[in-house]
């Protein structure tokens, strides 16, 4: 198992080598899970297309200030972002994908310190 810090270091190396066009095809042509982050370009919603050989892809959009109603009926402005999971149901059971999104939402909404790299 890889912890979050090691994953961050590995990700940083992949990004660096990708930007310098040093990745080999086998490093980006297959995988079990892909993350597509167009949020860093200000895109606030999109659907990511599942690449062949991939079990699922998570589309992460930009966060935006949004007017929301509180549980008590109050009105507030909160930052919200859209994420969208596309999964190959031959590989990933839909209920597992839904549970993943629920856990991700809880992490983002209540435990933001877990997301810092």
Residue ranges and their predicted role:
Residues 1-117:
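C-terminal catalytic/motor cores of large multi-domain enzyme assemblies
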């Amino acid at each position: 198992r890889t912890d979050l810090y090691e994953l961050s270091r590995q990700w940083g190396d992949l990004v660096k080598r990708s930007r310098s066009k040093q990745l080999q095809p086998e490093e980006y042509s297959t995988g079990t899970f892909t993350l597509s982050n167009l949020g860093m370009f200000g895109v606030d919603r999109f659907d990511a297309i599942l690449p062949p050989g991939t079990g699922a892809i998570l589309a992460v959009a930009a966060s935006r200030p949004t007017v929301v109603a509180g549980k008590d009926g109050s009105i507030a402005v909160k930052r919200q972002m859209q994420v969208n999971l596309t999964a190959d149901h031959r590989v990933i059971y839909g209920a597992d994908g839904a549970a993943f999104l629920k856990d991700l939402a809880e992490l983002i909404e209540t435990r933001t310190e877990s997301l810092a790299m």
